[in-house]
Structure formats: C-alpha cells, structure tokens
C-alpha cells in the first residue's frame, strides 16, 4: 500500500492506524451490505463528499456485527472442517461458501481449501476454492476440468476460483480434487 502514489501521500497526511481502521470499517460495511444497493449508493454519496467511514452513522457498530459473524464462521470451520492429504474442505450450512473458504484454507494449513454450500432450489452445490501462495497448481484450470467432467461448470484464477457441481457429485468432486492435486 505504501508504494502507491496516492496511498503514500495519504499515509503522510494521516496516521497509519487511522487509515487502516477506517478501511476495515468500510470493508465490513460494503461486504455486509453487498446486496443492499440503496446503502451502497449512500456510501458512495457520503464518501464522494470526502467523509471518512468513522463519520457515518452506525458504521462501527455494523462492522462489529460483521466481525462477530466471521468469528462464528471461524469457530464452525474449526469444528466441521475435514482434512484430506492434499486439501481441506467443508460443507457450509448457514453462510456463504466464499466467506468460509479462506478460513478453511488458513486454519487447515493445507495448500488448498474448499468450501461448498447446497443450493437446494437448484439441485447443485456452489463451491469456492482457494490456494495458498505455495500452491503450484492453477486451481481455476483444475476446477474447470473436474467440474465439467461431473456435469457442472467452474473456473477462475490460479489461487481463487469457484464452481457449481450437481448435488450428487460433490463428494466425487472433492475426491477428484484431492487426487489430482496429489498427482501434480
């Protein structure tokens, strides 16, 4: 952050902790309201008037609520995550898979973390996959191949990707990912 032209000027003007706290509060408010376009437009309007996140009503309180939710997810990951030879995985029941997958990756110590959530209305699992910096496999390509072979679809970046997999194929998806990661 420090080596970017705008950021380096701002960090000369403001205390680093001040900037980091405001950035964190803003991030939690954006993520927590990601489906509330009215609130997001309100944020844009306020920020475009050069207001800081700490100056906006209830932003700290909302960020605290979001942190509490993340702590609950982390606790559930610690209790429910399964570790295989080449990856860790977990079915998510009450939050989004993309919110849990980073905890699965980080808590497990594995190079690959997978979180998946059933979409009962569609008969599929929504899958999020993350790789550590030391993961040598392009996960987006691997996920695309494996999910397609199982009647789903997916892909993405080398360290962050996702898929949709038919409900009855999720266990096979995880097994195939574990197997193919081991053969690379």
Task: State what each model feature region is.
Residues 6, 86-184:
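Glycine-rich, acidic loop segments that terminate in or are immediately followed by a histidine
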């Amino acid at each position: 952050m420090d080596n970017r032209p705008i950021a380096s000027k701002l960090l000369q003007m403001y205390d680093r902790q001040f900037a980091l706290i405001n950035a964190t509060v803003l991030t939690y408010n954006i993520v927590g309201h990601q489906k509330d376009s009215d609130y997001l437009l309100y944020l844009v309007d306020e920020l475009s008037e050069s207001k800081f996140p700490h100056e906006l009503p209830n932003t700290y309180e909302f960020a605290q609520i979001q942190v509490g939710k993340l702590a609950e997810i982390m606790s559930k990951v610690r209790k429910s995550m399964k570790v295989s030879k080449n990856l860790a995985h977990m079915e998510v029941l009450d939050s989004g898979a993309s919110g849990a997958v980073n905890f699965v990756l980080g808590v497990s110590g594995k190079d690959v973390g997978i979180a998946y959530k059933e979409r009962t209305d569609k008969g599929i699992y929504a899958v999020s996959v993350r790789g550590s910096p030391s993961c040598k496999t392009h996960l987006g390509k691997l996920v695309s191949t494996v999910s397609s072979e199982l009647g789903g679809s997916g892909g993405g970046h080398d360290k962050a990707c996702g898929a949709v997999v038919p409900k009855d194929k999720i266990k096979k998806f995880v097994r195939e990912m574990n197997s193919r990661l081991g053969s690379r």
